[in-house]
Amino acid sequence: MNKGIIGKKLGMTQIFLEDGTRVPVTVVQAGPCVVLQKKTAEVDGYSAVQVGFETVNAAKANSADRGHCVKAGKGVFRHLRELKLEQEAELNIGDELTVQQFEPGDLIDVTGTSIGKGFQGVIKRHNFKGGRASHGSRFHRAPGSIGCSATPSRVFKNKKMPGQMGNERVTVQRLQVVRVDADQNLILIKGAIPDSKNNVVVIKDSVKATK
């Protein structure tokens, strides 16, 4: 991964391109993020950088957080994330990552937490068809049989059944950067991304970046 940054989802809107095309976009306030720690393969077993986003009052942070951020000299940060960047060796503690590393047309992957839907049935959770809506069937939204008979006398793992839906880590791939506003640290991404408004998402180069 060559590029990466942490941002806060602000919401969705729509913009018009020069040819008049209307494009739905998600607005993300991305960075600036400060490099707080470098992890190397020799010491940690892998190479990455830990970055901080959104400063907070140092008086509200515990001593461990204050001590961890003091080397960067940029304050104490609310959100810490690790990014595996190829240019990890070129980054030093205290360096900043900004939206200027992205350009319109770039393909990115966005990682966030999907919105929780609570306990849901198989029709909403797994797109089951459901039974006939006829009189006397008594089978409308039920999942049906979940296993076999005496052999194997159990329910197989990963069987699609009712349960908790959403509220899990999700990555949406190959989203396109429509516009970058370096003055306000905003990046406009085509389409929808995971997570709710004002929550933190991770933006990075797409692993399927072929245009």
From Swiss-Prot:
The answer, when asked if Ribonucleoprotein is one of the entry's keywords, is yes
Give the UniProt entry's GO cellular component terms.
cytosolic large ribosomal subunit
Q: An example of a Gene Ontology BP annotation on this entry?
A: translation
Say which domain of life the source belongs to. Bacteria
**Keyword field:** Ribonucleoprotein, Ribosomal protein, RNA-binding, rRNA-binding
Does the record carry Metal-binding as a key word?
Answer: no
| GO molecular function terms attached to this record | rRNA binding; structural constituent of ribosome
Q: Where is the signal peptide?
A: none
Record PROSITE patterns: RIBOSOMAL_L3
- HAMAP family this protein is in? Ribosomal_uL3_B (MF_01325_B)
Q: What does this protein do?
A: One of the primary rRNA binding proteins, it binds directly near the 3'-end of the 23S rRNA, where it nucleates assembly of the 50S subunit.
Oligomeric and partner information: Part of the 50S ribosomal subunit. Forms a cluster with proteins L14 and L19.
Task: Give the family, as the similarity comment puts it.
Answer: Belongs to the universal ribosomal protein uL3 family.
The protein, known as:
Large ribosomal subunit protein uL3
